[in-house]
Amino acid sequence: YTDVDEWMDSGIEAAFVHVATAAHESVIRSLLERGIAVYVDKPISDNLAEVKQLIDLADSKGLLLTAGFNRRFAPMIRRLKEIPDKNMLFIRKGRINLVEPVRQAVYDLFLHIGDAALYLLDEEVLSVQSKIIEKDGNLKRIWVELETKTASCFVSMNYEAGANQEVMEIQSPEGIVRVVDLTDMTTSDQAGTHLTGFGDWEGTLRKRGFEPLIRGFIEGIMKKENPVTTDSAYLSHSLCEKILQDNGY
């Protein structure tokens, strides 16, 4: 197809949206209004009011609107989720000399690790503290502290880290478990330190959570079950907006 409207009207039942964030709202709305289920690469929109409107539209039509939060489906992160009695969580993302306006950086990149934090926490977040460091309107660093009744979670992102790396660490009375770049797990406890990885033939899409998420979306269309509930997706977008508002953006 050379015309997007012709494509939308061709009888498709679902669509994967991978366009610039600025175009998300109009493209998603057009698809939903035609009765087409949508999988969208994060974010749904960088405008929280638009996120709510699109979620309400999807729900009113009984359609899936699935945000592409692949970390929830990465096997190693699912193992972190299963750890009982978590009391301290550290999530950090580093990038090499990345230059992005603050709002774009928070919604396009921080959103993923913010969502991972909310996914890994087992209770309602009671308080949020945050700090954004920027220069000339571009993000330098950001840190966020989330508190639940029984756990503290620290989330940070550094655009001048000197290395591209993502680390998630869970601490509990049983030990410390750390996952680097979604694939390499280190467990430290009273018995020592243990390394866990994937086999040589394990596919990258599965290791990073994309394969199970996409399968969940396709199966969810038939079952009417969203692998990423719209309530949880909205909560993650709301966290980003709160951070921006609290820091004057």
Task: Cite the ranges covered by each PLM segment.
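Mid-domain beta-loop-alpha active-site segment that forms a flexible
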Residues: 68-75, 96-125, 213, 233
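Beta-loop-alpha module in the N-terminal Rossmann-like domain of NAD(P)-dependent dehydrogenases
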Residues: 1-39, 43-55
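A short glycine-threonine-serine/GTX helix/turn-capping micro-motif
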Residues: 101-107, 200-208
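Hydrophobic residues in well-ordered beta-strands that form the structural core
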Residues: 40, 65-67, 179
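A contiguous active-site-proximal alpha/beta segment in oxidoreductase catalytic domains
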Residues: 22, 45-100
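Contiguous beta-strand/loop segments that form the cofactor/metal-binding neighborhood of enzyme cores
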Residues: 111-184, 211-224
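C-terminal helix-rich "cap/oligomerization" subdomain common to oxidoreductases
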Residues: 14-19, 63, 216-249
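Short, Asp-centered acidic motifs that coordinate Mg2+ and/or phosphate
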Residues: 13-14, 88, 152
